[in-house]
């Protein structure tokens, strides 16, 4: 919805496509869109994108093939949390035990970093940059293969994605097994 508002305000055309969670269907969708779109904005299921990240979609990003929006990986790494607390980390407590889907390298500009490795679930692809360098989009290790082909992938580290993870309630699991709970 927020992206549509930005598109209307900036007189940008957009098309919304839905795809199943199958990695091959996702790769097929990207292949089909790469020749007819200037940019592909991909948002995986259960992710809400903040306004600052959406504004990045409309920035020029010259010499960039893909801009990823780093997100949190499911679960809390308690060993990492303990380590950071003991070291007196200046990182916010709410982030100390979290791992992210993107590993970054050197800073390029404010909030934009070069990517070492990523498995981002939200990203924007500048198709004209990618189209020149990569003939195929692969379902497995898409970002690794794009980097191998010489594509430049950067991360917008100021993104604040809200990621929803499905967890089963313990009482539902027990109830399905025939255990009565009060």
Please describe what each predicted stretch is.
Residues 2-43, 47-55, 59-62:
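Active-site-proximal specificity loops/subdomain of glycosyltransferases
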Residues 18, 68-69, 155-157:
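Structural signal for conserved beta-strand scaffold positions within catalytic alpha/beta enzyme cores
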Residues 22, 72-75, 158-162:
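Short beta-alpha junction loops
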Residues 25-31, 78-80, 164-168:
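Short, solvent-exposed polar/charged micro-motifs at secondary-structure junctions
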Residues 112, 117-182:
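C-terminal catalytic/acceptor-binding lobe
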């Amino acid at each position: 919805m927020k992206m549509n508002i930005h598109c209307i305000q900036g007189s940008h055309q957009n098309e919304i496509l839905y795809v199943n969670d199958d990695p091959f269907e996702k790769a097929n969708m990207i292949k089909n869109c790469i020749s007819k779109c200037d940019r592909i904005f991909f948002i995986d299921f259960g992710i809400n994108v903040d306004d600052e990240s959406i504004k990045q979609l409309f920035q020029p990003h010259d010499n960039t093939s893909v801009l990823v929006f780093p997100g949190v990986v499911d679960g809390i790494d308690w060993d990492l949390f303990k380590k950071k607390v003991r070291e007196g980390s200046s990182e916010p407590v709410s982030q100390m035990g979290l791992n992210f889907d993107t590993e970054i390298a050197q800073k390029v500009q404010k909030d934009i970093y070069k990517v070492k490795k990523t498995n981002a679930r939200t990203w924007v692809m500048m198709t004209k940059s990618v189209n020149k360098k990569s003939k195929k989009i692969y379902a497995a290790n898409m970002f690794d293969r794009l980097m191998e082909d010489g594509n430049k992938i950067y991360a917008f580290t100021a993104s604040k994605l809200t990621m929803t993870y499905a967890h089963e309630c313990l009482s539902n699991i027990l109830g399905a097994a025939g255990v009565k709970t009060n």
